[in-house]
């Protein structure tokens, strides 16, 4: 990976995030679309772009726990549940956790939970560290279509000027597993 090209694309993506725009970036298994989770405008743009219902809720991805802690109602998590999450993080595991009562419905959808993941992927770590907070993360595709696996796929599907962080997807062959930490149910396992 060209360090200069990566840094140039990182700066461009961070600027877009601050401007409440949507970006694409490589994740563990595919390219993702992301935006600032604190911006209703940005999240609604992302949902419109994907043609995704607000009722479904979204995933937040972070480089460390402090970036997602404010979204979680920790009083509803046991020590064992936290231990389970930290055992699997950083990595390709997303957990549905009780949402803090202040988390907006544009993130939780129709649920009282929020989906969170701490990633081990270089690109996500860099993005979240430089941006200083978690990102909304969803697959780079129109709902019910195949996800983008390369930068070229993203540019083909979303336009040649779409901001894409330079890099490659990780070695996972499927999207992250989603586990409801409260009841232990596996929501998504492909």
Curated annotation (Swiss-Prot):
Pfam families: Sua5_yciO_yrdC
Predominant location category: cytoplasm
Classification via InterPro entries: DHBP_synth_RibB-like_a/b_dom (IPR017945), Sua5-like_dom (IPR006070), TC-AMP_synthase (IPR023535), TC-AMP_synthase_SUA5 (IPR050156)
GO biological process: regulation of translational fidelity; tRNA threonylcarbamoyladenosine modification
Reaction(s) catalysed (UniProt annotation): L-threonine + hydrogencarbonate + ATP = L-threonylcarbamoyladenylate + diphosphate + H2O
Keyword Ligase appears in the UniProt entry: no
UniProt keyword annotations, A-Z: ATP-binding, Cytoplasm, Nucleotide-binding, Nucleotidyltransferase, Transferase, tRNA processing
Single GO cellular component term: cytoplasm
Location of the YrdC-like domain: 7-190
GO molecular function list: ATP binding; double-stranded RNA binding; L-threonylcarbamoyladenylate synthase; tRNA binding
E.C. number(s) listed in UniProt: 2.7.7.87
The keyword Protease belongs to this UniProt entry's keyword annotation: no
Protein's cellular compartments: Cytoplasm
Record's function text: Required for the formation of a threonylcarbamoyl group on adenosine at position 37 (t(6)A37) in tRNAs that read codons beginning with adenine. Catalyzes the conversion of L-threonine, HCO(3)(-)/CO(2) and ATP to give threonylcarbamoyl-AMP (TC-AMP) as the acyladenylate intermediate, with the release of diphosphate.
Family: Belongs to the SUA5 family. TsaC subfamily.
Protein name (Swiss-Prot/TrEMBL): Threonylcarbamoyl-AMP synthase
Source species of the chain: Buchnera aphidicola subsp. Schizaphis graminum (strain Sg)
């Amino acid at each position: 990976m060209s360090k200069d090209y990566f840094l140039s694309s990182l700066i461009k993506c961070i600027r877009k995030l601050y401007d409440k725009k949507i970006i694409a970036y490589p994740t563990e298994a595919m390219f993702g679309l992301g935006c600032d989770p604190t911006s209703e405008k940005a999240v609604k743009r992302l949902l419109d772009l994907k043609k995704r219902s607000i009722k479904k809720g979204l995933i937040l991805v972070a480089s460390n726990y402090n970036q997602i802690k404010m979204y979680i109602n920790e009083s509803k998590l046991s020590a064992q549940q936290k231990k389970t999450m930290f055992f699997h993080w950083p990595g390709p595991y997303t957990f549905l956790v009780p949402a803090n009562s202040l988390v907006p419905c544009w993130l939780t959808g129709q649920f009282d939970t929020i989906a969170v993941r701490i990633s081990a992927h270089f690109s996500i770590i860099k993005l979240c560290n430089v941006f200083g907070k978690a990102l909304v993360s969803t697959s780079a595709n129109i709902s019910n279509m195949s996800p983008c696996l390369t930068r070229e796929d993203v540019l083909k599907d979303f336009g040649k000027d779409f901001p894409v962080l330079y890099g490659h997807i990780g070695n996972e062959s499927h999207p992250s597993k989603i586990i409801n930490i409260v009841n232990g149910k596996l929501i998504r396992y492909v």
